[in-house]
Structures are given as structure tokens and as C-alpha cells.
Amino acid sequence: MDSAPFVPPDFVVPSSLETPLFRLEPLGPQHNEADYAAWTSSIEHIRNTPGYPDGNWPDGRSIADNLRDLGRHADDFEHRRGFTYTVLDPGTADIIGCVYIYPDADDSRRAVVQSWVRASRAELDIPLWRAVSVWLETSWPFAGVTYDDRQPD
């Protein structure tokens, strides 16, 4: 990986994205139980989501392992190495899914983005992809973005 910073030092990282359908906020340890419930109820659905080609994630980790993973994502966010957002229902604050924004392995000025929604909220996958795609284009300083396209059924 090159030595360029993922985002410029003076860039103010967005703390949220709000739409009528969902709200994004930085993922952290405080989301552990709800995050764990969201992805463990949707493993096959997530594995069939564009951007998860190897079918190995999510794995069978424990809730304690999930907490460590959320801590790592929060640390990455704090140190600007990557940005993971939880996707929340704006009315109930239930976790709908996640969005991961990390540097491309070959060019850290480019972002590789993945997202998922829980199976029970599958209808939000395309609206989430559309909103995040526009947000990345208009509010982030990346030289380019790789984010697997969503096609309506």
C-alpha cells in the first residue's frame, strides 16, 4: 500500500448521513448486542450481497469477538484508517446494517466500500447503496471509489 493518507488531515469526517429511510452513525462498542443480532440473523443474506464474493463473512464469531471487532472499527475511525458506520432505522434506532469505507490496498486515496442490510430489511439495500454512493461523491475527498453496483430485481 502507498503512504498517502486515506483522507487529508484537514478533512472533517462526516459524523452521520440521514435520510427518511435510515441514519448512519459511526459504529462502536455501544452497538455490540444490536449489531450482533442484526448480522447473525442474516448470514446467508449478507453472503449473497454484492461486495461479499468469497462467502466467508460473516463468520461464526461470538458476541465477545464481535465486541473486539467493533472496538477495532472504532479505533480505525478515530485514527482515520477506515470508517465504519452502523445503519439505523430513524424511527426506532434498530440496526439495519453496516457500511465499511476503507482504503484500496493499491492506492490509499481510493476507497473500497461494502455495505449490508439485515435480511428482514432487504428492501433497503438499493436505497442504501444509492444514498451512500451520492454521499461518497459529494462529501468525501476520495480519488475514486469501488462499491459493488446494486441492480434492482
Give each language-model segment a name.
Residues E123:
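Conserved polymerase palm-domain catalytic core
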Residues M1-S120, A131, W135-D153:
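GNAT-family acyltransferases
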Residues I126-W129:
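Mature exported/compartmentalized surface modules and terminal targeting/interaction regions
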